[in-house]
Amino acid sequence: MSDIWDDEEVRETPSEITRVKRDHSQAGYLAGVTKAKDESLQEGFNAGYPIGGQLGLSIGRIFGYLQGKGLVEEEKQARKELSSTRIFDRQYWTTDAAPTYEGVHPLVKQWENKIDVMKRE
C-alpha cells in the first residue's frame, strides 16, 4: 500500500471514469431542470396572478350581488356557469395559459350583462 503523499500517478479505471462522468452529468442535468422549473413556475405565477385575481374579483361581485338580492336560483345558475371547470375551459385559454379573449372573460361578461339588466328592472 502506498502513502497518499507519494508521487505515484493515481490512475482511475475506465469504469470509474465513466461512473464519475455519469454522476456529474446527472447532477448537472438535475440542477438545470430544477432551475428551469423554478424560473418557469415563477414566470407563470407572475403572468397568471393578475388574470386570476381579476377573474376572482369579478366573479365574487356577481355572486355577492345575487346573494345580496336574495336571488337564490340565479345564484345557483351563476355558480354552475362560472365554475372553475367552465372558466378554465380550453376554449378560453391557449396551451401557454394565456387568455384567448380580449378584456373580460366571456362567461363573466354574460353575467355582468345579466346583472345590468336586473338592475334596470
Curated annotation (Swiss-Prot):
<protein>
    <recommendedName>
        <fullName>Protein YAE1</fullName>
    </recommendedName>
</protein>
<dbReference type="GO" id="GO:0051604">
    <property type="term" value="P:protein maturation"/>
</dbReference>
<keyword id="KW-0539">Nucleus</keyword>
<keyword id="KW-0963">Cytoplasm</keyword>
<dbReference type="GO" id="GO:0005737">
    <property type="term" value="C:cytoplasm"/>
</dbReference>
<dbReference type="InterPro" id="IPR038881">
    <property type="entry name" value="Yae1-like"/>
</dbReference>
<comment type="similarity">
    <text>Belongs to the YAE1 family.</text>
</comment>
<dbReference type="InterPro" id="IPR019191">
    <property type="entry name" value="Essential_protein_Yae1_N"/>
</dbReference>
<comment type="function">
    <text>The complex LTO1:YAE1 may function as a target specific adapter that probably recruits apo-RPLI1 to the cytosolic iron-sulfur protein assembly (CIA) complex machinery. May be required for biogenesis of the large ribosomal subunit and initiation of translation.</text>
</comment>
<dbReference type="GO" id="GO:0005634">
    <property type="term" value="C:nucleus"/>
</dbReference>
<comment type="subunit">
    <text>May form a complex with LTO1.</text>
</comment>
<dbReference type="Pfam" id="PF09811">
    <property type="entry name" value="Yae1_N"/>
</dbReference>
<feature type="region of interest" description="deca-GX3 motif; required for interaction with LTO1">
    <location>
        <begin position="28"/>
        <end position="68"/>
    </location>
</feature>
